[in-house]
Amino acid sequence: MTDLIKLTIAQSHKLLKERKLSSAELTRAHLDRIEKLEPEIKAFMTVCPESALAQAKAADEAIKQGHIRPLTGIPMALKDVLCTKGIRTTCSSRMLENFVPPYNAHVVDKLAEEGAVLLGKTNMDEFAMGSSTENSAFFTTHNPWNTAKVPGGSSGGSAACVAASEAVFSLGSDTGGSIRQPASFCSVTGLKPSYGMVSRYGLVAFASSLDQIGPFTKDVLDCALVMNAIAGFDDRDSTSVPQTAPDFSSCLDGDIKGFKLGVPKEYFSHNMRADIAEKINDALGVLSGLGASVDREVSLPHTPYALAVYYILAPSEASANLSRYDGVKYGYSYNQTENMWEAMEKTRAKGFGPEVKRRIMIGTYALSAGYYDAWYVKAQKVRTLISQEFNNAFEKYDALITPTTPNLPFSIGEKLSDPFEMYMCDTCTIPINIAGLPAISIPAGFVDGLPVGLQIIGKPFADQTIMRIAHAFQCATAWHKETPRL
């Protein structure tokens, strides 16, 4: 039989349905893989072998009774920013090191309804703030393609576990590129859905107007199958859009002849490596060969301001969202003083890591009385201009094509001393969050043995369009089938 850890969701489902494979066998194979590789990859914060095997047994019983859905019995992992009832949810922070939520996130319930098997929770940058997973308070995740390199962030553990075949799929969150950038660095498929497409209920908030939950998978078909399970309206999330989600897997069929694709010039900036740009040009050639028309002269002039806008708006929202961690209600509490104000101050000083404290201070400054108009209000105005530019572009184009990142996976420790250099890793992904658009990163080749990602951007709620283009690309190439030697 095919190596079980190499199977996609679709392949696993077929074998499970035909009773040629059991979920228990599939789950045990992935737990064995985790046990073997975790000392080197360090993708998981928490592994749940007993409950995973129990869920697999239940899935096998359901299949025996003829009750099987596309994700029934499929082993998966969750970024440790999604609440899981009875399983600790740390956000890779000392502040929540021992926090066990009393409820599940909406997407966790949806996957449970499907019968998916939860292997464990994955490592991340603390409170989803970072681009390398080095900001985890506990340990750094390593890139499966080169363990001296970072896997990207903040969802580095979720990307690495799929790339290393420790899970068939995983979920992450994306605030400024935290699904797409690690998907690029780890050579997997990663989708940031349209804002409001997937409920954020039970997602520990970083920046509420930017956060979105999405999948990491081995290919676009698997991505569509996961989206079929998690997308849709949820009245517990005020930003969830009240509309019926499409059948994403059925949208993949058909060619892309006649599709109009735009290539924004601003995404090939001075900090873009020439060899990455060359790989993207090769990918554009593939899309052109599939019948799409490619316009390389698109301009989105406000793109250079997106990074500054993001680092005003996101920290401002984080400053408000993280004010709840005061040591009083839950989480870490400094209890070596009887003075309440000192206890709160010490709780936050000791519970939060350096990057989280940096962003809280930036956000608090931007929201302060003397600077609110000069910084926060102005950033919101520029956000509107960026969104309008995208809207204008989508009147002419079906999708926009860019690199996912301007750089290759970098060495662990290389950028930690320079926060600005780290922030620059997300220049191609941040504008999409600012505008609330869907975007997908898919493997597009390698440079010096390290992965390069292709980003496909769509207009709001045209997630199925970008997935169709991505699927067509994967049908014409084999980059997504490459796996690291571990």
Swiss-Prot record:
According to its UniProt entry, the protein's GO biological process terms are:
translation
Which residue positions are annotated as catalytic?
K79 (charge relay system), S154 (charge relay system), S178 (acyl-ester intermediate)
For this UniProt entry, what's an example GO CC term? glutamyl-tRNA(Gln) amidotransferase complex
Give the InterPro entries listed for this entry. Amidase, Amidase_CS, Amidase_dom, AS_sf, GatA
Where would one find the signal peptide in this protein?
none
Which Gene3D superfamilies does this UniProt record tie to the protein?
Amidase signature (AS) domain
Per the record, the similarity remark reads: Belongs to the amidase family. GatA subfamily.
Q: What PANTHER family does this protein map onto?
A: GLUTAMYL-TRNA(GLN) AMIDOTRANSFERASE SUBUNIT A, TRANSAMIDASE
Query: What does the subunit section of this Swiss-Prot or TrEMBL entry state?
Result: Heterotrimer of A, B and C subunits.
Name assigned to this protein: Glutamyl-tRNA(Gln) amidotransferase subunit A
